[in-house]
Every structure is written in C-alpha cells, then in structure tokens.
C-alpha cells in the first residue's frame, strides 16, 4: 500500500520539540531509503562512514559538513535552501547550528555493507579510532560506539602527536 504524501513543513512544526540535543534526529520514513529530519545544535566530533551516498537539504539555518577528503579535513557549508550530495565512502561530520533543521536521505544498507564511526586528532588529523558495524537502527546504533570511544583515554590519545581528543562534558569524569 502506498504511503500518502507528507507535508514536510507541517511535520517539522509538529515534531520540532524532538529535534533538539542530545538526539535531534527523527526518521520520518524508511523503505529503501532512510529519510530523516535533523535539528541543531550539535557538537559532533566523530565522522560517519557510509558505503552509500547521502543527500543533504538544509531547510532552516546553516550547517557545516566536515569531511575527510583524500587525507585532508575540509569544511563544506550548506545554507538554508541548499542541497548537497555526498559521494559514497566519504567520512563526514555534520555540524549543525542552533535552530537549524535539515533533511538527510540515505539509502538503506545492503546486506554486506557496514557503517563506520571514525575520530581524527584535532591537532594533526591522524585517525584515532574507527568502529565498523552493521547498521540496523540509525537512532540507536551510534550511542554505544560513542560511549566506547569517549570513555577511553587510550583511544582518545593520538599516537602521532600525543594530543588527547576532548570528550563531551557528560564524559568528563571518565578518564579510564
């Protein structure tokens, strides 16, 4: 059975209260594609690795898509009304401004594909840690990986330059 059209602006207004930290992400449809609305602000330090492309449409406000491009970190600003198609296998870290709202479309993963979360040293851009996993639920599969990385001082310490990657405030008491 066909799903009726969704009035995107009305959906955002009805669910705006859910588009805030710490999650800020709601899946609105999933059938071949994962269609999400994401609200800001956020302060992600991880990079997401997806074997498929991702499509970004900035509805309100601005965001910066940090990417790892051939070993170099760079920023791609995406403003309200702009779209951007991220090619497959490009590590990226969406940085959303307060009050911003974006639509993100990803294709569902193929059975053999895995998602990844990566962290890079903010001083020298050396890869600190990478976790690959089969993605089953985009809203619940990431937090355990975040916890594992941020709770480990060893994983957050750069083997190249010795810099310690900062952990979000909620992990501040954890230095094991």
From Swiss-Prot:
Which enzyme class, named as a word? oxidoreductase
NCBIfam families per the record? anthran_nbaC, PRK13264.1
Q: Per its record, what are the GO molecular function terms?
A: 3-hydroxyanthranilate 3,4-dioxygenase activity; ferrous iron binding
Give the encoding gene's name.
nbaC
Recorded hits in Gene3D superfamilies, A to Z, give:
Jelly Rolls (2.60.120.10)
Necessary cofactors = Fe(2+)
Q: What InterPro entries is this protein classified in? A: 3hydroanth_dOase, RmlC-like_jellyroll, RmlC_Cupin_sf
Listed binding positions for Fe cation 2 are: 121, 124, 158, 161
Q: Which residues bind Fe cation 1?
A: 48, 54, 92
Species this chain originates from: Xanthomonas campestris pv. campestris (strain ATCC 33913 / DSM 3586 / NCPPB 528 / LMG 568 / P 25)
Q: Where does substrate bind?
A: 54, 96, 106
Q: What is its EC number?
A: 1.13.11.6
Q: What this chain does, per the record? A: Catalyzes the oxidative ring opening of 3-hydroxyanthranilate to 2-amino-3-carboxymuconate semialdehyde, which spontaneously cyclizes to quinolinate.
Q: What is this protein called?
A: 3-hydroxyanthranilate 3,4-dioxygenase
Family from the record: Belongs to the 3-HAO family.
CDD domains tied to this protein: cupin_HAO
């Amino acid at each position: 059975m066909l799903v009726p059209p969704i009035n995107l602006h009305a959906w955002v207004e009805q669910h705006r209260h859910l588009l805030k930290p710490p999650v800020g992400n709601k899946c609105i449809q999933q059938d071949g594609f994962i269609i999400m609305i994401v609200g800001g602000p956020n302060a992600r330090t991880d990079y997401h690795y997806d074997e498929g492309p991702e499509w970004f449409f900035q509805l309100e406000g601005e965001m910066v898509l940090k990417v790892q491009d051939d070993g170099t970190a760079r920023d791609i600003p995406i403003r309200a009304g702009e779209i951007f198609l991220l090619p497959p296998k490009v590590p990226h870290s969406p940085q959303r401004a307060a009050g911003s709202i974006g639509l993100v479309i990803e294709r569902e993963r193929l059975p053999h594909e895995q998602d990844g979360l990566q962290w890079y040293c903010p001083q020298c851009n050396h890869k600190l840690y990478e976790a690959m996993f089969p993605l089953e639920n985009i809203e619940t599969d990431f937090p355990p990986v975040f916890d594992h990385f941020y709770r480990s001082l060893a994983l957050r310490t750069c083997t190249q330059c010795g810099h310690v990657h900062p952990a979000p405030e909620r992990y501040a008491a954890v230095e094991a």
